[in-house]
């Protein structure tokens, strides 16, 4: 059944190896999570979904998770690290923030996750890399109310250009 299929006590949601402006599709999520946690039948249940937020807002790249049973859930959200560079190692990208909180959730509740990606690298000898993406954990609502936000963790800064480290 539903509870038996999801007997894990912890799971890490990630960008599923996808980089760029868009998050993973549902097929990419299923493939990635089946490789990471093969004992879970990710493709045989409605636990993981993309679909839409309340049927109105397209959710491509969002990860929607259905809570398998009532309980207290600890959620850690990490912002992504900033991009690095190809030419110099005089500066390092910033690490993303980490935010942790506990929430009482009920079986069937849905949470939406937008998992930040590492910032793009600098491919120029005098350029800076991009900042890392933020990670958001939200209630399954198509509103902008602060009450619909569980956690937000900011992404890290990109690596400074070569000359910036000497000032």
Regions found by a protein language model. Name each.
Residues 2-36:
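Boundary/junction segments of secreted and surface-exposed precursor proteins
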Residues 5, 49, 54-57, 62-73, ...:
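Extracellular and analogous surface-interaction loops
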Residues 35-47:
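Aromatic- and Gly/Pro-rich amphipathic surface segment
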Residues 44-59, 88-95:
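Extracellular beta-rich ligand/substrate-recognition surface
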Residues 71-81:
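A short beta-strand element within beta-rich, extracytoplasmic domains
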Residues 81-85, 119-122:
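Extended, low-complexity, turn-rich repeat/linker tracts enriched in Gly/Pro/Ser/Thr and Asp/Glu
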Residues 93-167:
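Secretome/extracellular-domain signature
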């Amino acid at each position: 059944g539903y509870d038996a299929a999801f007997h894990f006590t912890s799971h890490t949601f990630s960008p599923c190896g996808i980089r760029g402006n868009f998050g993973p599709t549902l097929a990419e999520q299923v493939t990635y999570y089946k490789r990471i946690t093969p004992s879970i039948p990710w493709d045989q249940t409605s636990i993981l979904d993309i679909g839409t937020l309340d049927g109105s807002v397209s959710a491509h790249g969002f990860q929607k998770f259905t809570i398998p049973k009532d309980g207290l859930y600890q959620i850690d959200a990490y912002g992504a690290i900033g991009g690095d560079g190809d030419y110099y190692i005089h500066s390092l990208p910033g690490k993303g923030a980490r935010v942790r909180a506990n929430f009482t959730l009920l079986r069937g509740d849905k949470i939406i996750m937008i998992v930040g990606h590492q910032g793009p690298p600098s491919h120029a000898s005098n350029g800076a890399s991009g900042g890392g993406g933020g990670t958001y954990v939200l209630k399954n609502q198509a509103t902008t109310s602060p009450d619909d936000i569980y956690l937000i963790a900011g992404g890290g800064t990109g690596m400074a250009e070569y000359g910036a480290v000497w000032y």
